[in-house]
C-alpha cells in the first residue's frame, strides 16, 4: 500500500468519525512519503482536533505548524492551529498564527473569518462578568455554552457555567462540572467553593462543609467560602435548636427557631421545605392550624415530592374538617410511598369523614362535642327545644319564624339520633340503622313526639312534677296534637312561664293526667308552684 492509499483510507475512517484509525493511516502516509507532504500533516491535525483532548489539541497544533513549515501557502494549517489554540483558551496564540497567515495572504476569506471568530469570542468573554451572568442566568448560559463549544478548556468559563447552573437550580450538573475541574486541580479554592455550593444546595451539608473548609485551607482569605461556611453553620444551629425545643415541648420557641432558620437563605429550597414542615408541626401544637397548612403548602411547593409534608397537611385538613383536601393529600402521599399501608387507612378514614360531613352535624346542632354523654346531650336538647319551640316563636316575622321552625326540627332529629345508643353509634360510623350511608334528612322522625316524650319522661330524669304550672292557659302547644303533657306531676297546674314567654289566659289542657286549668282547679293547690320568679324556673 502506498502513501496515497493510506491517506485515502484515513479519509474514509475520518468520515466515519473513527479518528484514531484515521490517525494511524495518516501516520503511515507520512512515513511512506518521508514526511514531505503538508496535506498529510494537515489531515492528521484535523483528526487530532476532532478528538479534542488537551493532548490531542497540542498534537494538532504541532502537525499544523509542520504543515505550514512544509508549505507556507497551506491555509488549513493556520486555521486548524488557531482552532486548537482557541479550544485551549490560548487566544493570543490563535490570533498570532492567523496574523502569520494574513501576512502571506491578506485577503484570504478563511483566515479573515477565523480572525473575526477570535475577536467575537474574546468580546463575549469580556462581557460575561460574574455579576452580569448571575443576574440573567438563562441568557448567559446560552452564551457560555456557545463559547465553550469552540473553547472547550476555558476553565474560567467552565466555573462561570457552574455558578450559572447553580443559579438555575441545576445542582447535579454544576457538581459534575466542578468534579472534572477538581480532578485536574484539587487544591483550587474557587473550584472547591463552587462544588461545595452545589452540594450545599443539594442539602449535602457534611460534604459541602468539607469543601468550604478545604477551600479556606488552601486560601484562608477566600471570602466566598468563609461566608458560605458561616451561613451553613447558622442554619444547622437554628434547625438543631428548633428540634430540641420541639422535643422538650416548647413549641413557641421551636417555631421561633425554625422561623430564624428560614430567614437565613431563601434559596436553600430542600432544607427550607423541611424547615417549613417542622414549623408546621410546631404550629399544630400551638393550635394555629391554618398557619400550619400554609407552611405545609410552602414545603410541597418547594419540593412536590415531599411526602411527609403532604401527610402533615392532610392531618391539619382533617382538624379543619376539610376532608376532600385531606383525601387528596393522603392520596398524593400514597403515590409517593405506595408501600405505606398506614396511608391507605388514612385515606379510608378521610373519605368516611367526608361522607359524614355531607350530613347534618347533629353534634354541632346541639352544640355539644362528639364525646358528649347522655346527660350533656339531654341538657343541650332541653335548652334548645324550649328556645326554638314554635309556640315561643309564633309572633316572629315569617322568615325568622321559618328559621326557628327548621332549627326546632333539626334539634329534634339530632336528639332522636344522639339519645339512642345504637343510632348514635351508627351515625358516628357514617351509617344508618340498615348499615347504609346515613341519611341526613331523618324524614320519618315526628319532632313533636320527640319533644313530648322527652318532657313526659322528665327530661333530665327529675320530672317536672311537684309544682303546678299555672297561667299556661290560652291555646295549647301547636302541633302537639291534643295529648298534652301527661305524667308531668300529680294534679299540679303549670305556674309561671316555663318557656320564658307568656302563654296568655284562657282554656286549659285536657287529658294530661291532671287538669291544666287556666286559673282554676289545682293551679295553686297541692305542691308548691314553680313560678316565673322561682329559683327553679325552666328556661
Curated annotation (Swiss-Prot):
InterPro entries: DnaJ_domain (IPR001623), DnaJ_domain_CS (IPR018253), J_dom_sf (IPR036869), TPR-like_helical_dom_sf (IPR011990), TPR_rpt (IPR019734). Keywords: Chaperone, Repeat, TPR repeat. Residues 361-431 form the J domain. Gene3D superfamilies: DnaJ domain (1.10.287.110), Tetratricopeptide repeat domain (1.25.40.10). TPR repeats lie at residues 3-36, 75-108, 189-222, 235-268, 273-306, 307-340. Disulfide bonds: none annotated. Residues 521-531 have a biased composition (Basic residues). Signal peptide: none annotated. One of its GO terms (cellular component) is phagocytic vesicle. Residues 512-539 are annotated as: Disordered. This is DnaJ homolog subfamily C member 7 homolog. The gene is dnajc7.
Amino acid at each position: 500500500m502506498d502513501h496515497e492509499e493510506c491517506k485515502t483510507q484515513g479519509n474514509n475512517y475520518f468520515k466515519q468519525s473513527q479518528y484514531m484509525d484515521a490517525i494511524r493511516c495518516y501516520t503511515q502516509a507520512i512515513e511512506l512519503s518521508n514526511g514531505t507532504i503538508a496535506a498529510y500533516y494537515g489531515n492528521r491535525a484535523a483528526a487530532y482536533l476532532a478528538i479534542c483532548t488537551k493532548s490531542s489539541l497540542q498534537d494538532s497544533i504541532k502537525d499544523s505548524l509542520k504543515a505550514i513549515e512544509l508549505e507556507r501557502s497551506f491555509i488549513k494549517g493556520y486555521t486548524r492551529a488557531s482552532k486548537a489554540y482557541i479550544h485551549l483558551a490560548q487566544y493570543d496564540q490563535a490570533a498570532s498564527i492567523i496574523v502569520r497567515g494574513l501576512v502571506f495572504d491578506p485577503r484570504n476569506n478563511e483566515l479573515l473569518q477565523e480572525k473575526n471568530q477570535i475577536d467575537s469570542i474574546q468580546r463575549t468573554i469580556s462581557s460575561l462578568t460574574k455579576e452580569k451572568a448571575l443576574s440573567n442566568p438563562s441568557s448567559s448560559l446560552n452564551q457560555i455554552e456557545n463559547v465553550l463549544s469552540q473553547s472547550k478548556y476555558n476553565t474560567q468559563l467552565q466555573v462561570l457555567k457552574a455558578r450559572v447552573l447553580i443559579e438555575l437550580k441545576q445542582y447535579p450538573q454544576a457538581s459534575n462540572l466542578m468534579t472534572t475541574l477538581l480532578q485536574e486541580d484539587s487544591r483550587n479554592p474557587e473550584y472547591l467553593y463552587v462544588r461545595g455550593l452545589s452540594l450545599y444546595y443539594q442539602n449535602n451539608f457534611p460534604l459541602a462543609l468539607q469543601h468550604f473548609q478545604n477551600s479556606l485551607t488552601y486560601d484562608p482569605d477566600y471570602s466566598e467560602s468563609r461566608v458560605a461556611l458561616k451561613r451553613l453553620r447558622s442554619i444547622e444551629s437554628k434547625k438543631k435548636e428548633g428540634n430540641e425545643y420541639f422535643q422538650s415541648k416548647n413549641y413557641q420557641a421551636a417555631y421561633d427557631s425554625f422561623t430564624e432558620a428560614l430567614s437565613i437563605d431563601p434559596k436553600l429550597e430542600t432544607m427550607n421545605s423541611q424547615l417549613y414542615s417542622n414549623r408546621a408541626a410546631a404550629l399544630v401544637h400551638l393550635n394555629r392550624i391554618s398557619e400550619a397548612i400554609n407552611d405545609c403548602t410552602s414545603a410541597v411547593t418547594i419540593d412536590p415530592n415531599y411526602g411527609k409534608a403532604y401527610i402533615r397537611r392532610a392531618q391539619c385538613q382533617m382538624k379543619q374538617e376539610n376532608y376532600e383536601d385531606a383525601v387528596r393529600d393522603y392520596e398524593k402521599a400514597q403515590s409517593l410511598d405506595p408501600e405505606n399501608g398506614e396511608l391507605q387507612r388514612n385515606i379510608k378514614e378521610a373519605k368516611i369523614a367526608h361522607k359524614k360531613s355531607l350530613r347534618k352535624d347533629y353534634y354541632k346542632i346541639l352544640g355539644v362535642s362528639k364525646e358528649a354523654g347522655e346527660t350533656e346531650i339531654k341538657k343541650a336538647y332541653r335548652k334548645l327545644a324550649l328556645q326554638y319551640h314554635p309556640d315561643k316563636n309564633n309572633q316572629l316575622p315569617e322568615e325568622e319564624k321559618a328559621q326557628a321552625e327548621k332549627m326546632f326540627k333539626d334539634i329534634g332529629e339530632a336528639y332522636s339520633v344522639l339519645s339512642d345508643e345504637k343510632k348514635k353509634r351508627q351515625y358516628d360510623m357514617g351509617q344508618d340503622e340498615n348499615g347504609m350511608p346515613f341519611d341526613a334528612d331523618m324524614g320519618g322522625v315526628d319532632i313533636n313526639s320527640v319533644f313530648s316524650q322527652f318532657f313526659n319522661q322528665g327530661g333530665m330524669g327529675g320530672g317536672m312534677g311537684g309544682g303546678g304550672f299555672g297561667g299556661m292557659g290560652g291555646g295549647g302547644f301547636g302541633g302537639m296534637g291534643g295529648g298534652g303533657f301527661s305524667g308531668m306531676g300529680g294534679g299540679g297546674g303549670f305556674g309561671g312561664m316555663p318557656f320564658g314567654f307568656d302563654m296568655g289566659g284562657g282554656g286549659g289542657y285536657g287529658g294530661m293526667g291532671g287538669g291544666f286549668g287556666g286559673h282554676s282547679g289545682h293551679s295553686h293547690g297541692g305542691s308548691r308552684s314553680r313560678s316565673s320568679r322561682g329559683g327553679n324556673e325552666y328556661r
